[in-house]
């Protein structure tokens, strides 16, 4: 039977790479994310060309619970619910705590943490009914450790780790697994945007941000690729990972081993 995968924040970066990989494996794909209409159409058509199943896009804003509920209801009506849920949507803002805008805190917590609560809440009932499901939360090395100037992001990602463990325990006997992937620095549009932001905040050059801030903490001195994260997600979405639940897998070039 063809599985249906819902991937939030999947019009670029890690989410798009996961969508491509699951599409190649034959899954129906529900994309989600912002972009100009032409860009969304191009991405949807590209992913559709990789899958033998159905590929569509839902524009739910991850800061709006009603839109998330509408997306999950659409998936239930169209496909009988999500078999695979990948919570990947994420935003970032870098600033000293005393200057951190309240609206940015609220936005980051909403997108990076609360949206996962809402998608999981909608996904679990159909998964329980089927007796099978995979929930994969894209957390971060910042779900395990902290860095300066990222109070909201670090708080949200630590929250994702707690949410992952709690839900995994609640559904442990239902055939549903819940895990987190904790990447280090992956060269995505989100990370690329951080480079000039951190250069401004720290008063250093962009090259220094890359070499002395980002990759300094990764012993391999290399960015993780989106394809590497996607391959791990594919494994966690499969039957071979049925006994992996309530945990995280770090993919951080050795960052959190230090």
Swiss-Prot record:
Gene Ontology terms, MF aspect: 3-hydroxybutyrate dehydrogenase activity
Coiled-coil features, chain-numbered ranges: none
Active site (record annotation): 153
Catalyzed chemical reaction(s): (R)-3-hydroxybutanoate + NAD(+) = acetoacetate + NADH + H(+)
Residues that, per the record, bind NAD(+): 6-30
Domain of life: Bacteria
Keyword annotations from UniProtKB, A to Z: NAD, Oxidoreductase, Plasmid
Pfam families given in the database record: adh_short (PF00106)
Binding site for substrate: 140
InterPro entries cross-referenced by the UniProt entry: 3-OHbutyrate_DH, NAD(P)-bd_dom_sf, Sc_DH/Rdtase_CS, SDR, SDR_fam
EC number(s) reported in the record: 1.1.1.30
Keyword NAD carried by entry: yes
GO biological process: lipid metabolic process; monocarboxylic acid metabolic process
Family of this protein: Belongs to the short-chain dehydrogenases/reductases (SDR) family.
Protein name in UniProt: D-beta-hydroxybutyrate dehydrogenase
Naturally occurring in which organism (per UniProt): Rhizobium meliloti (strain 1021)
Gene: bdhA
